Amino acid sequence: MFSSLLPKPKYSSHEPTSRIKLKKVRAHEKSNQLVKLPENKSDIKVTHNPSNSESTISQLHLNPDGTLNYNLTIASSNSNSRKVQSSYEDTIPLKVKFPNLKHHFPRYTVETCPDDSLKECVEDTKAAINKMINEKMGVDEKTNNKKDDVTYIKYTSNNLVNDPEGSDDERGRERIIQIRNYQEDPMLPPKFKLRKNRHKNPSPPPPLLKSSNNEQTSKLTKEDQAKWQIPSAISNWKNNQGFTISLDKRMVAANGGSELATNDVNLEKFGELSQALENADKQAREEIKIRSEMLKQLAIKEQHEKENKLKELADIARSKKLNNKRPPNGDYDDVKKKTKY
């Protein structure tokens, strides 16, 4: 198959055969005959059985080497208006096959289109969209086509309402009502608000009542009545209604409805605790005083030691100075008088 894509040889007298034609013959003739390919260019007629009406191949095209060219054979069997993709290259898109190809396809409008195909397409599309809109809105085509769909109703009012005097004139009591279907705008916001079906808490269980027998019933005491008194809920954070609530009621509500209990103070234990705290305070003060005295004595002792060291160093320096200034011949007392300390 690839030999057909090669160029024609220059230095040879080889001429490939062009085609093999099929010719229809009569039914009594047989067409199953082998035909030899000629060496020179010529047309070969091949007969086939005309009873096989399903076959659409009318010509067989051959390659230069004598093999059947399927591409040309399939293309010739179809009409000229149809394009046959007989190879892999035919399936490749043009944008992939020629990436740098610049093409300008004609874009017609309704006015510039040579035929009425574009106009028909626009009308069909418009009709389909209108049909879908009418189906959504629930409007029939018959009612939509009628522009003046108006009905009139004649109505006669009651004597008691419009004519209190009781006159029998029907002309003054006749009314004509006009009924017209107005189309509603589908883009208007909804008129009714849809509320969610919020599930409420179930109802409380039924109360357990006492029996009506006089033997088992007993009168309520004050203690039982006080237990059944439930105080109102008072919040320390919210007061939407703005009520003024006294402090004692707020304290009762904060304690869960029970009254404030007074706490008794144990005086004996409290006295022992205060005495123990006083003793601990005294002991701590004495320890601090002793510690401060010891630190003071140590500081005085260190100061005396430093003074003694300084005196010793001064005496040593003085003796060295006297030894250096003493004359070799002379009275020591005269020199001592002249020196100034």
From Swiss-Prot:
Region (Disordered): 1-31, 181-226, 302-341
GO cellular component annotations of the record: spliceosomal complex
Record field: compositional bias (Basic and acidic residues): 302-318
Keywords from the named record: mRNA processing, mRNA splicing, Nucleus, Spliceosome
Biased composition (Basic residues): 192-201
Organism domain of life: Eukaryota
GO biological process, one term: mRNA splicing, via spliceosome
Record localization: Nucleus
Membrane-spanning parts: none
Principal location listed in the UniProt entry: nucleus
Function of the molecule: Involved in pre-mRNA splicing.
Quaternary structure, from the entry: Associated with the spliceosome.
UniProt family annotation: Belongs to the SNW family.
Name of protein: Pre-mRNA-processing protein 45
High-level lineage: Eukaryota, Fungi, Dikarya, Ascomycota, Saccharomycotina
Chain's gene name: PRP45
